[in-house]
């Protein structure tokens, strides 16, 4: 069983992609996060056994895409990085510059690099932030989305995990093809924690108690 065999990654690297005059660049950040997830920080996933189980099930599943959406400051980026730490040695690539999605040459370089890594057996994992405008419609000029679809299904499908993060307020805004069964593991909406949920989260994290009188972002 994947969940029982899992051992947190003690040390790894996140390759963050940059855009410059010479094309796609790459930096390296050490990732020492052991991948421990506070399930209480993500109450919307409790019905699936908690965030830890949900993420492990995604990593073990054949589907490629996991879509995070919702208000800023609600924990999307944090859970993305937790997933990276639990990814069993995948080559993790972070993109948070929309220019890489918008410029066809850069988008093609990114997808080409992913295919090369996959062919070398490095099992790439893409963490794609700020994708709001680029996952909504398959239109002229949106080369990134078209290539993303080819990565995640069909004859060109690669062994890749893709986590999308946007500030969209409704999953219906995401292109239906990205949500297709077999391609997508699911959508997760990130919302504010209720006062009771926030208090419980602080208690579990062994933080100083605080009284909340209204819903708050996880970042608060």
Please state what every model-predicted region is:
Residues 61-80:
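Walker A/P-loop nucleotide-binding motif
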Residues 30-59:
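N-terminal pre-Walker A segment at the start of P-loop NTPase domains
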